[in-house]
From Swiss-Prot:
One of its GO terms (cellular component) is extracellular matrix. GO terms for biological process: cell population proliferation; extracellular matrix organization; positive regulation of cell population proliferation. Glycans are attached at residues 254, 392. Disulfide bonds: none annotated. It is found in: Secreted, Extracellular space, Extracellular matrix. The gene is Hpse2. It comes from the Eukaryota. This is Inactive heparanase-2. Belongs to the glycosyl hydrolase 79 family. Binds heparin and heparan sulfate with high affinity, but lacks heparanase activity. Inhibits HPSE, possibly by competing for its substrates (in vitro). Keywords: Extracellular matrix, Glycoprotein, Secreted, Signal. Pfam families: Glyco_hydro_79n.
């Protein structure tokens, strides 16, 4: 713009300027001031780093939730846990009485605790009481002279306790155990890579320790029996299982049961295949063993715990459902996302990977509903990476994107229970490490347990979708799920709603609550990595505060950050969080 009235450098006094010129200048300055104020009023946000980022941040996502009726209702124990029988091999079973481990497990109750895995079908029960004489593997001399004696002394001390048997293991004892487990970890990995497994002995003492851990932690034990003990005609040999059933019944242990683990792999690991109809007959045989035992006459039975539903696996499931579909209380299968030997940190952010589970769910549901419509389906033994996991990846913050999306997707598609492999174990897929410290997925699971109820709600968004280019599929990098808030959480009244959101974008996203959620108070629980490692961090922060245990018997308080009513939710890039929308008075959430 040119100003037609200009002044010389040696300006005269204002009184000497022509009146028409002064008016024109005044009008021009007023116009500039008005434009400046308008600009600043409408742009109170950080300046974009580049043009692309600026365009993304202008997209405001409107979010509403259907509050009249839930679309699904899952099990109260929806998020459950698994322990692998390898803890017998590496010695960690003897430390399940640890006060710290029990505290961590109790934080995730109520839940099922499945005792099963790849070594299920190599497990034999022996009714022995002396753990020192029955433990496999000689080990170094100091293990035999000191370590084993310490275990025996610890067991004697525990036997004197009434009720829950809790131990405080000395640091030296734990350090020796970590050395032993580290050596055994190499043996276990070799077995897994070669697909050849050695036999395991479960003693009565070990079963007592396992049940004590589950009972003290508020977990319901599901025990997977060995299905590979076969008679010459390929029928199941139940002698070892019957011995275990009689012992646990004599102790009045409240246990549910399974038979076998990934039966589709039996030919490769045992040289003898078991088809679906034979496995169905084996389950009927197990049911007939349980019914005469008063303690287990009404015990739940789950199976067949198949692997990824490829063509041959679907055929096995089909044969099983024809014969024993009505025998089991829920149909179970397993899922692994990535090969742990080749995984990279960016793999955990790939939406294509997050979506692989959805197709498997539909395949399983199709077979189950053909024979037993409405039968509950469980995903057991879900892991992010195979081969025991990958250090600094499957035990890091990055793995949480897969885990949280798995929880949201399974509930949305009607899967009743998901069992996480593993709560505590060798390798790097666990929730708790071998120093008994909770890893990022533990804190994520704890938040889920505290805030998420079993009722699933439908989410409606606007401003999120865009038209794909020809030949391309748009996969959401912003994932939003909604449930009724956990009614056991006394910080929130019935009728509140909890959102959990995954932002895989490299830019922040803004979400405006609309409809029934509009102008409601919100509590934010934003979970981010803590420390210099970023996505590879094994520590997390909640709303900027690092999460650590207070002591061996106390979990930290999970403090929310209150957001004022009507405030836009801002989701930072590559993060996840929970948002409790208070006092919605949602009809779907007011009653159990």
């Amino acid at each position: 713009m040119r100003v037609l009235c200009a002044f010389p450098e040696a300006m005269a006094s204002s009184s000497s300027r022509p009146p028409s010129c002064l008016a024109l200048v005044a009008l021009f300055l007023a116009l500039l001031l008005h434009l400046s104020l308008s600009f600043h009023a409408g742009n109170r946000r950080p300046l974009p780093v580049d043009r692309a980022t600026g365009l993304k941040e202008k997209t405001l996502i409107l979010l509403d939730v259907s509050t009249k009726n839930p679309v699904r209702t899952v099990n109260e124990n929806f998020l459950s846990l698994q322990l692998d029988p390898s803890i017998i091999h590496d010695g960690w079973l003897d430390f399940l009485s640890s006060k710290r481990l029990v505290t961590l497990a109790r934080g995730l109750s109520p839940a099922f605790l499945r005792f099963g895995g790849k070594r299920t079908d190599f497990l034999q029960f022996q009714n022995l009481r002396n753990p020192a004489k029955s433990r496999g593997g000689p080990g170094p001399d100091y293990y035999l002279k000191n370590y084993e004696d310490d275990i025996v002394r610890s067991d004697v001390a525990l036997d004197k306790q009434k009720g829950c048997k809790i131990a405080q293991h000395p640091d030296v004892m734990l350090e020796l155990q970590r050395e032993k487990a580290s050596q055994m970890h190499l043996v276990l990995l070799k077995e897994q890579y070669s697909n050849t497994y050695s036999n395991l002995i479960l003693t009565a003492r070990s079963l007592d320790k396992l049940y004590n851990f589950a009972d003290c932690s508020g977990l319901h034990l599901i025990f997977a029996l060995n299905a590979l003990r076969r008679n010459p005609n390929n029928s199941w040999n139940s002698s070892s299982a019957l011995s275990l059933l009689k012992y646990s019944a004599s102790k009045k242990y409240n246990i549910s049961w399974e038979l076998g683990n990934e039966p589709n792999n039996y030919r490769s690991i045992h040289g003898r295949a078991v088809n679906g109809s034979q496995l169905g007959k084996d389950y009927i045989q197990l049911k007939s063993l349980l019914q005469p035992i008063r303690v287990y006459s009404r015990a739940s039975l789950y199976g067949p715990n198949i692997g990824r539903p490829r063509k041959n696996v679907i055929a096995l499931l089909d044969g099983f459902m024809k014969v024993a579909g009505s025998t089991v209380d829920a149909v179970t299968w397993q899922h692994c996302y990535i090969d742990g030997r080749v995984v990279k940190v960016m793999d955990f952010l790939k939406t294509r990977l997050l979506d692989t589970l959805s197709d498997q769910i539909r395949k399983i549901q199709k077979v189950v509903n053909t024979y037993t419509p409405g039968k509950k389906i469980w995903l057991e033994g879900v892991v992010t990476t195979s081969a025991g996991g990958t250090n600094n990846l499957s035990d890091s913050y990055a793995a949480g994107f897969l885990w949280l999306n798995t929880l949201g997707m399974l509930a949305n598609q009607g899967i009743d229970v998901v069992i996480r492999h593993s709560f505590f174990d060798h390798g790097y897929n666990h929730l708790v490490d071998q120093n008994f410290n909770p890893l990022p997925d533990y804190w994520l699971s704890l938040l889920y347990k505290r805030l998420i109820g079993p009722k699933v709600l439908a989410v409606h968004v606007a401003g999120l979708q865009r038209k794909p280019r020809p030949g391309r599929v748009i996969r959401d990098k912003l994932r939003i799920y909604a449930h009724c808030t956990n009614h056991h959480n006394h910080n929130y009244v019935r009728g509140s709603i909890t959102l959990f959101i995954i932002n895989l974008h490299r830019s922040r996203k803004k979400i405006k609550l609309a409809g029934t959620l509009r102008d409601k108070l919100v509590h934010q629980y934003l979970l981010q990595p803590y420390g210099q490692e970023g996505l590879k961090s094994k520590s997390v922060q909640l709303n900027g505060q690092p999460l650590v245990m207070v002591d061996d018997g106390t979990l930290p308080e999970l403090k929310p950050r209150p957001l004022r009513a009507g405030r836009t939710l801002v989701i930072p890039p590559v993060t996840m969080g929970f948002y409790v929308v208070k006092n919605v008075n949602a009809l779907a959430c007011r009653y159990r």
